[in-house]
UniProtKB/Swiss-Prot annotation:
Gene: rplA
Protein name (Swiss-Prot/TrEMBL): Large ribosomal subunit protein uL1
Cellular component annotations (GO), alphabetically ordered: cytosolic large ribosomal subunit
GO biological process: regulation of translation; translation
Annotated organism of origin: Beijerinckia indica subsp. indica (strain ATCC 9039 / DSM 1715 / NCIMB 8712)
Highest taxon of the lineage: Bacteria
PROSITE patterns associated with the record: RIBOSOMAL_L1
């Protein structure tokens, strides 16, 4: 058995793969097993009772994690004039218009979040086939198409996490780092679950939040009892 294989097996020890753990106990198990040589990301996965193939069952939104993600995002803003200056002052890493479009079309995407003023969207729309599949296309529903570019930049830098349901009815997202204090992770998890709960679409039928699990980058998954997560 390889060294990696042994570590995986050891990390799974003591975890009941069927049991629904209270969220605080699950976080403890995750932190204890996050033993990689880097600060592992703690991730949440939620199985929802929706079929995103139907427009009235799409789940999408953004949540501002109270304690951030522990990751520094590179933010790009499509804007001109005063709004471009505003974005730079707020801490945007890249700001541009036609020049930034050309850069992206040339294959360089040096950012993790993309924001645009409404007047820039006809221009940014040309990048749909490039930004869309990467989840980077600005969208007014999650606050990334806005005149308040300063607020959007600060939110992105401060812990704003976008979420969108995938084909199988699953939503995944980062809720912090394994090095975070337990209480901070619990607060972030509660905020994420609450945001998804509030984004329940009208077309959802039956049990909306069906399963929730936590894991770290290199660690095993731990199923949690959704009833123990409170915002």
């Amino acid at each position: 058995m390889t060294h990696v294989g042994k570590r995986v097996v050891k990390n799974r020890e003591g975890i009941d793969r069927v049991k629904l753990y209270p969220v605080d106990e699950a976080v403890k198990l995750i932190k204890e097993r996050a033993n990689a040589k880097f600060d592992e990301t703690v991730e949440i996965a939620m199985n929802l009772g929706v079929d995103p193939k139907h427009a009235d069952q799409m789940v999408r939104g953004v949540v501002n994690l109270p304690n951030g993600t522990g990751r520094t995002l590179r933010v790009a803003v499509f804007a001109r004039g005063a709004k471009a200056d505003e974005a730079l002052a707020a801490g945007a890493d890249i700001v541009g218009a036609e020049d930034l479009v050309a850069t992206v079309q040339g294959g360089t995407i040096a950012f993790d979040r993309c924001i645009a003023t409404p007047d820039m969207m006809p221009l940014v729309g040309r990048l749909g086939k490039v930004l869309g599949p990467r989840g980077l296309m600005p969208n007014p529903k999650v606050g990334t198409v806005t005149m308040d570019v300063a607020g959007a930049v600060k939110a992105s830098k401060g812990g704003a996490v976008e979420f969108r349901v995938e084909k199988a009815g699953i939503i995944q997202g980062s809720v912090g780092k394994a090095s975070f204090e337990t209480e901070k992770l619990l607060e972030n998890i509660a905020a994420f679950v609450d945001a998804v709960a509030k984004a329940k679409p009208q077309g959802a039928k039956g049990t909306y939040i069906q399963r929730v699990a936590l894991s770290s980058t290199m660690g095993p998954g731990v199923k949690i009892d959704p009833a123990t997560v409170t915002a």
